[in-house]
A protein has these predicted regions:
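Beta-strand-turn-beta hairpins that frame and shape the catalytic cleft
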Residues: 102, 111-124, 209-210, 217-230, ...
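Active-site metal-binding loops of divalent metal-dependent hydrolases
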Residues: 127-131, 159-161, 190-191, 215-216, ...
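Conserved beta-sheet core of the metallophosphoesterase superfamily
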Residues: 176, 261-340, 344-345
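Short beta-strand/loop segments at the ligand-binding rim of alpha/beta enzyme cores
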Residues: 246-256
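Extended active-site neighborhood of metal-dependent phosphoesterases/phosphodiesterases
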Residues: 84-85, 91-96, 108-110, 172-237, ...
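Acidic, histidine-bearing metal-coordination/catalytic regions of metal-dependent phosphoesterases
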Residues: 14-122, 133
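Membrane-embedded segments
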Residues: 100-102, 114-202, 207-210
Length: 346
């Protein structure tokens, strides 16, 4: 393992920070196959001569434009229609302005069950802050500024908030500065069940945030609604192997918030229209799309970006922001996710 790590670090040192910001995987779909070709998506997308990567990269002239403080280069990564759903995505490099966050990944999520009142509804999603690991106080303050700048309607959080109970209060005190019309919701990660669970729950409630542990809440607007469901400890399937979405109506638009992406394959998450997860850190250390250590038992299938479970339910997996074990990221840029909802009208 030390030899592998040293090799990865040497490779990383040969690349600039901007070049190490990976583009999003692009699902490859055809009439005979619903799922992305995982081998192509992982083994090929980060290779310099891969045709899909060439499509995603911005032009050389745009890369050389250093006058702008924030890059507005966008990378179209997927455009598909599946079971009444259309999803497109782009990324914006913010690493030159904000400490601790490399990019904002934006999704336009179009679905037939999105209510008209929620057309243009913006969701900010963050996960795996692991405060204070790689994310320090300045990075946290920059993260708050960046989240405020997104003007989201709701903030969702995917767990693994801290690397010590002494960091819980300052973390949520800072995040409380992010005010959204529909509030802030969060689930717990494995770190949060190992330590500080009660501190986190109580601190979130103190700052007006809503922890969701096998619970659902309804967001209402102009007489219409969408539902946010949150999973309690997804690693304990003996207690939590029944999804909180099963009792919901298939007519509602339902977002499932869960720490690990494996959960949506391990159990039935019927009535879910979109799932959001973290946990993987995008591999955390990844060179040419290959990570020596993966914390999903589905391997490369659920690592980062847009994926689907066997029931064809779309899942967005974030790289997250912080780190665990080693305070380093290579080829897995720290990111926040912004999702804009649209109603499919065709």
């Amino acid at each position: 393992y030390p030899v592998i790590l040293l090799t990865l670090l040497l490779l990383a040192s040969c690349k600039s920070k901007k070049n190490m910001v990976a583009t999003l995987p692009r699902p490859v779909l055809n009439s005979d196959s619903i799922y992305p070709d995982t081998a192509n998506a992982i083994a090929g997308l980060f290779s310099p001569d891969h045709s899909q990567l060439k499509e995603l990269n911005v032009s050389k002239n745009k890369k050389q434009n250093t006058k702008k403080k924030t890059s507005t280069d966008t990378h179209e990564s997927s455009d598909l229609v599946l079971r009444g759903t259309k999803i497109t995505s782009s990324s914006v490099d913010v690493s030159s302005v904000y400490t601790g966050v490399d990019r904002v990944v934006k999704y336009d999520f179009t679905h037939r069950d999105v209510p008209e009142a929620f057309e243009g509804f913006r969701i900010a999603f963050i996960s795996d802050l692991h405060y204070k690991s790689l994310l320090k106080e300045k990075g946290l303050n920059d993260l708050v500024r960046l989240l405020i700048a997104q003007k989201a309607d709701v903030l969702l959080m995917g767990g693994d908030y801290q690397e010590g109970c002494e960091y819980v209060e300052p973390l949520f005190s800072a995040l409380a500065r992010v005010k959204t019309p529909m509030g802030t919701y969060g689930v717990m990660g494995n770190n949060d069940y190992e330590r500080c669970h009660d501190d986190i729950v109580n601190t979130m409630k103190h700052y007006g945030m809503r922890p969701l542990e096998h619970e659902v809440d309804t967001l209402r607007k102009d007489g219409q609604q969408i539902i946010i469901a949150g999973v309690r400890n997804p690693f304990d399937l003996g207690r939590n192997g029944v999804s909180p979405t099963l009792a919901l109506s298939p007519k509602d638009f339902v977002i499932l918030l869960v720490h690990t992406p494996d959960y949506i394959e391990d159990v039935s998450v019927a009535n879910t229209d979109l799932a959001l997860a973290g946990h993987t850190h995008g591999g955390q250390v990844r060179v040419f799309g290959v990570a020596p250590a993966l914390n999903s038992h589905y391997g490369n299938r659920f690592i980062t970006g847009l994926a689907y479970n066997s029931a064809k339910i779309p899942l967005i997996i974030t790289n997250g922001i912080g780190t665990s074990k080693l305070p380093i990221r290579v080829g897995a840029p720290a990111e926040i996710i912004v999702i804009t909802l649209h109603r499919l009208t065709e």
